[in-house]
Amino acid sequence: MNKLALYCRAGFEKELAGEITDKAAQLGVFGFVNLTEQSGYVIFECYQANEADHLAREIKFEQLIFARQMIVVGELLEDLPTADRISPIIAQYKTLQPKHSSALFVETPDTNEAKALLTFCRKFTVPLRNSLKQEGWLTSSDNVKDSISLHILFIRPGCCYVGYAYNHNKSPFFMGIPRLKFPSDAPSRSTLKLEEAILTFIPINQEKKRFNEQMKGVDLGACPGGWTYQLVKRGLFVYAVDHGKIAATLHETGRIEHCVEDGFKFQPPKLKQMDWLVCDMVERPMRISQLIGKWLMNGWCRETIFNLKLPMKKRYHEVQLCLSLFRQLTKQGLCFKLQAKHLYHDREEITVHIVIMGKK
């Protein structure tokens, strides 16, 4: 098994290919990418043996922007016999001997064509899991060092990649997609973007510390209040900045102040530091990056989540340009952590999280 299979949103295969090639090169690993546009996944094949496993350990999954999942796979299994699809899969795993495996995922790429296989995948999972357990696998705990999950990626009927992922360095979700329910009282579906971002960037055991009733936040471009809703739900008092109307249900909470201003000109009251800044404005990504950079360098907020709307072409290049802008925070003596992700609820955009850790 000397390939990586990485899942993504259909249409972003080239961006993911560029990203994984760069990340591998930074670790001194080289290879080539096989991709089909609109397929929802890419294959990165390493030139040297065992390098795919090395990448799966050393590339921090949380630092991959366009990947929903990252697994090590072998050669594509084609034309699985309908009478016995399991034996060829077991044969591939026998070369691995996955003793420290804990879970099984039988998945497809996130495309309409591939998702037609999901009913089959669900039915196939049970007998395959039983066969794997008979081999002595799938008996480990997630907490065991270097424990893995086994992943089968069906790309079309009778055709799959067999692989695994390290539990400490992967998405915990089936197909790499968190299943979130739209809150009936939320003002807009955009609320799911911020909810997924918080789930992605903030450890669950830190959420109450990072979001609570003693905190204040700012939502730039808040109308009608989808992102404000997520902050208010977690107890924050929010300055909702927008010329447009904010949902009456948010006003009724008593936890917001509607500031009818331009988000690019707004400054925090009395220039006091806010705990949170969130922003989902439709604007050029570089202009948004410059705006967020201003807030961070002026000390107007400690933590921020914002969206960057991507251009139609050279999207990966634009992301690199925008994120490189935040290097100036280091020049200002600020220590920070930055993560960016193309979330499931994002479309032609990525979501970025930055937290200021202190000063040098």
Curated annotation (Swiss-Prot):
EC number: 2.1.1.186
Cellular-component GO terms for this entry: cytoplasm
Catalytic residues of the enzyme: 309
Subunit-structure text: Monomer.
PANTHER family xrefs: RIBOSOMAL RNA LARGE SUBUNIT METHYLTRANSFERASE M (PTHR37524), RIBOSOMAL RNA METHYLTRANSFERASE FTSJ DOMAIN-CONTAINING PROTEIN (PTHR37524:SF2)
Family: Belongs to the class I-like SAM-binding methyltransferase superfamily. RNA methyltransferase RlmE family. RlmM subfamily.
Protein's recorded name: Ribosomal RNA large subunit methyltransferase M
